[in-house]
Amino acid sequence: MQQQILERIEDCYQQAEAYFKRAFPRPTTQFTLRGRSAGTAHLQQNRLRFNPVLLRENSEAFLAEVVPHEISHLLCFQIFGKTKPHGREWQSIMLKLFKISPNTTHNFDTQSVKGKDVEYRCACGPIRLGIRRHNKVLRGETRYLCKRCHTHLTLA
């Protein structure tokens, strides 16, 4: 599947070079993204990262939508410089070059990549915190208050 992604990236770049009548440097591609994001484009490094779990579960949509979406970010940066991430320049590349609706988010099932929750307690009952917030509590970086009763959350 990763080879198909690399081939799709090359196809997209050939399409872009024909459309814009100029050459573009090919990005470094990694399959190391975790969490609920399908892909990210690192503009200054000319690098793409894809989520291998979501790729495996949604291969057709990755080829059709996610790869062009992320490449559009890199192309937008290389053509226009710094712009809004999903601004009109990016939308134009999505629509005119790739002929894809410029959606900013995917609608993949993310149950398999969902982060772990940890149960905390306050005066009014149990509250679940995501792993990132839980780790901040463990490191002593912060304490959280319940939005309802305004008491500090404690690990259950």
Curated annotation (Swiss-Prot):
Residues 12-154 form the SprT-like domain. It comes from the Bacteria. Its main location: cytoplasm. The active site is at E70. Zn(2+) binds at H69, H73. Keywords: Cytoplasm, Metal-binding, Zinc. One of its GO terms (molecular function) is zinc ion binding. It holds the Pfam family SprT-like. It is found in: Cytoplasm. Its cofactor is Zn(2+). GO terms for cellular component: cytoplasm. Binds 1 zinc ion. GO terms for biological process: response to stress. PROSITE patterns: ZINC_PROTEASE. Belongs to the SprT family. NCBIfam families: PRK04860.1 (NF003421). This is Protein SprT. The gene is sprT.
